[in-house]
Amino acid sequence: MPRDYTDILYETTDHVARITINRPKQYNAFTGDTLKELTLAFEEANVDDEVGVVVLTGAGDKAFCAGGDVNWEKEGGLERQVLEPYLLHVTVSRCSKPVIARVNGYSIGGGNHLAYFCDFTIAADHAVFGQNGPRVGSPAGGPIVNYLAHVIGQKRAREMWMLCRRYTAKQALDWGLANAVVPMAELDAEVGRWCEELLALSPTCLRILKASFVAEFDHVLGQGDAVRRLTITPEFWKEEQQEGARAFLEKRKPDFSRFRKRRV
C-alpha cells in the first residue's frame, strides 16, 4: 500500500519509480521530515519488484535540491541530523536498482551530496553544482565528504568542498560529476532514454554490479564515519553554525574570524 508523503512525491510508471522533493518555494531544501520521507521512498522502491529504475529529482525548474532548509538548521535540526548515521545516503547507495539524479537546477550542499551518491546524474544545462559548508558554517564530515573524491578525484573534491565555488553543468560534465547535460526542454526525454536502456538489461546483473560498487562504499563509510564522529562535535554548534545561519537569514557575509583560535 503506497505511503502518504508530505514533502515528497512518489509515483511509479512503466517500471520507473520517480521520487520528487516537493518544496519548490524553498528551492527543494530539505528538513528532517524530508530526509525521512526520502529514505522511506527509496526503501519502498527497493522492495518493489515492479520497479527497475529510480529517478530522483526536485519540483519545478529552478532547483534539484538546495541542501538543508536554513530555518530548520537554525532551530537545531541539522545538529540532530549530523550526529546520526547518514541513513538517506546509505539507502540511496545500497538501493539495488539503478538510481538516476535528474538535476533540474541548483544542486547545492546536501543536494549535491544526493546527486553524487546516485548512480547517474543527468543535468539540465542551467544546473549549478557546489558545496556550502565552510561558507555558512554547516559542517559535513566522513563518508559524505570523502566519497566525492571517488567520483571526481581528490584535488577537485577538495576544491569543491573547501572553496565553496559554483560550477556549471558543463564543468560538472567535464569533471565526471554529471553523465550527460541537455537543455531543460530535453531533460525528461534524456532521462527517459537512460531508463529505457537500463530496463532492457538483465536486472540480476545490475543488482550484482550495484552490490559490487556498494562494497567499496561500505569501506569508505566505515572509515569515514569514525572520522566524522571524532571531528564533528556538539561544541561546534554553539557558535559557528549559528553565525552562518544568522548571516544567511540577515543577507550578510558571516564573520568567522573570531573562531580562529590556536588549538593544541
Question: Model-found features: residue ranges?
Answer:
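Well-ordered beta-strand positions
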Residues: 120, 159, 163-165, 171, ...
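Conserved CoA-thioester-binding segment of acyl-CoA-metabolizing enzymes
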Residues: 1-57, 264
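Glycine- (often His-adjacent) and acidic-residue-rich active-site loop
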Residues: 58-94, 107, 135-137, 220
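CoA-thioester-processing core
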Residues: 88-94, 102, 108-162, 175, ...
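Terminal low-complexity tails and localization/encapsulation signals of metabolic enzymes
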Residues: 1-5, 246-264
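C-terminal long alpha-helix characteristic of the crotonase
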Residues: 24, 122-127, 178-226, 234-239, ...
